[in-house]
Amino acid sequence: MQAATADSISVSNKSQNELIPFSQFLESLKEKMKQVFHVRADIDQLSLKRGLPPFVMREIMSVNPLSVGIPTQYGGRGGVMKENLGLLATASYESLALSLTFGINSALFLQPFGKFGQDEVKAPVFNRFLNDKAMGGLMITEPDYGSDALNMQTSYTESGSKYHLKGKKHWAGLTGWADFWLLSARQQSKSEKLQRDIDFFLCDVTAPGQNIVVEEFFENLGLYAIPYGRNHIDVQLPQTHKLVPETTGVKMMLDLLHRSRMQFPGMGMGFIQRMLDEALTHCKERMVGGKSLFQYDRVQHRLSKLQASYTICSAMCANSSEKAGLDVDLSSQGMEANAVKSVITDLMQEAAQSVVQLVGAKAYKLNHIAGRGTTDSRPFQIFEGSNDILYAQISEGLVKMMKRAKERNLFQFLKGYDLTDKAVHFVKSQVDFNLDLQIPQRKLVEMGKIIGRVISLNQVLDLSEKGFNKELIDGSVAFLQQEITKLMSAFNFKNEEKVVDGYDENTSWMNFVAG
């Protein structure tokens, strides 16, 4: 990768990739997905095996979907957030795994690399994405440091003109597939202690001294199309491969992760719409007791919840399009990013479970979109921050802000908070009380769920002001009011029960039955 070639590559890409309207761009992608998933092959059968046949990715990548994450000066579409979300939504209607593949490439590689990478290496990297259909990913998680990522043990030392990285990474999506990686590591001092800050480096696995050894491929429960595994890191990287943070490496990581979390609704959008469409079709066609399922009140309730999830996700996509651009520093926006990611992934899993319940036994198969959807959507509640942890962090952030504002009444605080100022009036009776700011951890999670849904309601009301379908808005408002009421009831119920040591003493039920 020589800096001297950067300008010529950039100009070449720009001339070759004149931007077509985004709607036309998406239609090209839809046509390719139709060909590979429904004409040349059957996605329900493809989903039974790990990976994807080469022709599938070859055809899909031929329309350069990843160009949405590449700056215009390098031949891409400019990294526009609305387009990134639109791409994810279009792909997830057909395949959640394909959408996540796009999301990994864009949100976890192209966007942070474009923002923090050194200029002299950008052109050749972006050129390989556009012309050679390269892929990229991110490695943060380690076998002993998942949620505790700040204490990662992957280290680096500087020697001459190179950085030497050593360590283990696992559960990075596209393990063994990606050509490029962003690797996270902590600098090792001369005393062999690791610095507190975290740095990120570009790694080109095709270059000498930069190969990453895959020690094991995992048998992941869902998302069969995406390889995961455990990686051994021992690479020598040029100084130009170090990403340059605006302040600290930790803040760079938070900006990266918060922007990624704000893009989860893109993956949720097409997925939830597909679940809704499948449910509507099945319920209108399936006859039970002389009438269609669609006519049963309980079924209507389930379908209305799916429509509410569709509306909430739409609101989140509109919100992220306006707030999560690459020009914005999101490192301090954890409250909103955590709420968006955790709530939408809960709704994704609930949507899949609901459709399986409606369809019945036929959906309990990997080659059924809803059955597959339950296992494919489940890890979204775990990766990039387990939802329980994110909900707890939301509450911790809330408590800090309330202490700073010297306000103990939850309603009064939320009324003056920009993420909740509209929604709080719809749930005043539920949140108008003085909050004990010494909240036990189990209650932190419950309160985080409540605040996450109040924030979601605020985004729905913002979407309403833009002219979105009023009936769907009203349905989602009612759904969120019910959810918040239910969660508040759980929060108010006092339960301090703990695990009983020696639970198996005098507990065999057979001893308490005669005969």
PLM regions with names:
Residues 218-309, 378-383, 387, 402-465:
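Glycine-rich beta->alpha junctions and the first turn(s) of the following alpha-helix
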Residues 44-46, 310-343, 356-357, 465:
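C-terminal helix-coil-helix/basic helical segment that borders enzyme active sites and/or dimer interfaces
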Residues 270-273, 277, 301-311, 338, ...:
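Generic structural signal for well-ordered, non-transmembrane alpha-helical segments
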